[in-house]
Every structure is written in structure tokens, then in C-alpha cells.
């Protein structure tokens, strides 16, 4: 049930012998994988499509390519290639639908490889963040109450991994009174993408 701010503060203060408050910040960093996004696509005259891709999610590649091109998923075979690093950054589909359309039009296999500059412009880093944590505990070390507030930088569009941060921060502990708050902060920068369990390390 909802608890107002004053009640939360009283809950921490009244249940604890000691209260610790800390603030943490993380920078927005790109996944920095060694090899850039790449794919090779071959479409036969009957729309049988084979995709070799360095994606981390072949089922997403197949589904998104089908959605964009209109080719049934049953006619698309997505084969994973060596990833060359990904860390979450290669879960988003960029090249494969485009290469599929070009292969279908040309009747020839099409290979597409992003340059490093294209990767930095098209993909996204993880969110920068600011976190405020307040924890109350007894003298014997038992945590009695905690509150976490997370501000995650989302870029030009909402979509920062708030759930990961707010959901993971207090998860390892059995805390009788715990509250987390997450804010998806839109800012003048590129969109964000997954990076190593999105949001969880921030929490």
C-alpha cells in the first residue's frame, strides 16, 4: 500500500540504531565490443532467407526481419556467427532487415558491416546514473529499513533500465521496510542500450 514520504522517514528513523546515507554516480559508457555489427544475407527466389549475423539474439533477428520485410519467420533461418563481443549492445537489430531487402532486390547475397563510427552513432551506451541510498540498521548489523532513489539518463527518448536498478538494489536482503524509486531522465544525448544486465549493476 502507498506510504507517504514522512512515514518512510519515520520508519527508517524509528527502527534503526544507525542510519547511513550515500550517493553514487556512474558514467554512460559504450559496450566497446571488439568487432562491429555485421551480417551476410542470402534470399532465394522463393523468399527462403538465410542470415548469418553477429547478433546476440538470433530469434530477435528472425522476428524483426520478418516483421519489416513481410517474409514469414518459417522462411527465415538465422545462423549465429562469432559475436566478437557484445555485452548487451548486439541485442538490437540494425542491419539484417536492410540486407534482406537488398538481397531480395538484387538476387545476390548481401554483406553489411558497420564502421566503428556507425556503431557509436547508431547503437547506444548504457545509462549514466545518480543513486541515493539510505539504510537503517540495528547495532547487531541487522538491516531494518532501506530506501533507494535512482535517476537514470535515458537519452532523447524514454527507456532507461529503471526496473533493473530499482528491482535489484535491495533484493539480496530481507528488509522489513524497503522502498525504491526510479526516474527515467530524458536528456539531450543518444538513446541507451543494454549493457551487462541492464540497470542491475547500478542497483
Describe each model-derived feature in a short phrase:
Residues 1-12:
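Single conserved hydrophobic/aromatic residue that forms the stacking wall/gate
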Residues 5-6, 22, 60-66, 71, ...:
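Gly/Pro-rich active-site capping loops and adjacent beta-alpha segments
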Residues 16-29, 112-119:
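Short Pro/Gly-enriched beta-strand edge/turn motifs at strand-loop
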Residues 17-19, 39, 48-50, 74-77, ...:
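Structural motif
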Residues 39-106, 152, 160-170, 194-203:
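Alpha-helical support elements that line or immediately flank enzyme active sites
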